[in-house]
Amino acid sequence: MSFTNLYQEIREEWKSLKKSEIYDVEKSRMIGWRHGPSVVRLDHPTRIDRARALGYKSKDGFIVVRSRVRRGGSNREKIMGGRRPRRLAYNKLTRKKSLKLIAEERAADKYPNLEVLNSYYVGEDGLYKYYEVILVDKSHPNIYNDPHISWISEPQNTGRVYRGLTSAGYKVRGLRTGRKGSSKSRPSIRANGRLRR
């Protein structure tokens, strides 16, 4: 069996996870993940097909971490000052960032010398969602000498996850769609508002 066929089979298993044979294994894994640390470095990706598709290579300079994020909307600290009840909102607030982007940022906080390349979903339970984040050491010789990934070593890509330059960041900023219907998303939501003043 070729690697292409193997990756395709893995991908098909993950598409219908609850019906597949690996579902029981995945459930037992998540019990351990739930009680462990929120950001954990892994020896190898859980979903090798997805990791390879997003640019991961099994060589020095690449690492994979699993990041855990609480599901649902966000809460903010309860407001103690007086105001109209409708202005008191402190729970059931919709996040402006996706859970995937939050997971990437937390992984970048844990490893400040690495850059986030991409991330992918690996599971969820009643309380958390789990993502695996691919991180790259941009100062490693394997990285800056590799023509496919050396672009991440350039200075303009420093801290890319915090500036919404990863795939999850682009989606949150509304830059996945074409020009029609998303005219207020470019050059950015904030800059567009300033231009229209």
Swiss-Prot record:
Q: Which UniProt keywords apply?
A: Ribonucleoprotein, Ribosomal protein
Database matches in Pfam families: Ribosomal_L15e
An example of a Gene Ontology BP annotation on this entry? cytoplasmic translation
- Report the InterPro entries cross-referenced here: Rbsml_eL15_core_dom_sf (IPR024794), Ribosomal_eL15 (IPR000439), Ribosomal_eL15_arc (IPR020926), Ribosomal_eL15_CS (IPR020925), Ribosomal_uL23/eL15/eS24_sf (IPR012678)
SUPFAM superfamilies annotated for this entry?
Ribosomal proteins S24e, L23 and L15e
- What Gene Ontology molecular function terms does this protein carry? RNA binding; structural constituent of ribosome
SMART domains for this protein: Ribosomal_L15e (SM01384)
Q: Which domain of life is it from?
A: Archaea
Q: According to its UniProt record, which protein family does this protein belong to?
A: Belongs to the eukaryotic ribosomal protein eL15 family.
Listed NCBIfam families: PRK04243.1
Classification via HAMAP family? Ribosomal_eL15 (MF_00256)
The record's section on PANTHER family has:
LARGE RIBOSOMAL SUBUNIT PROTEIN EL15, RIBOSOMAL PROTEIN L15
Instruction: Tell me the protein's name.
Output: Large ribosomal subunit protein eL15
Identify the coding gene. rpl15e
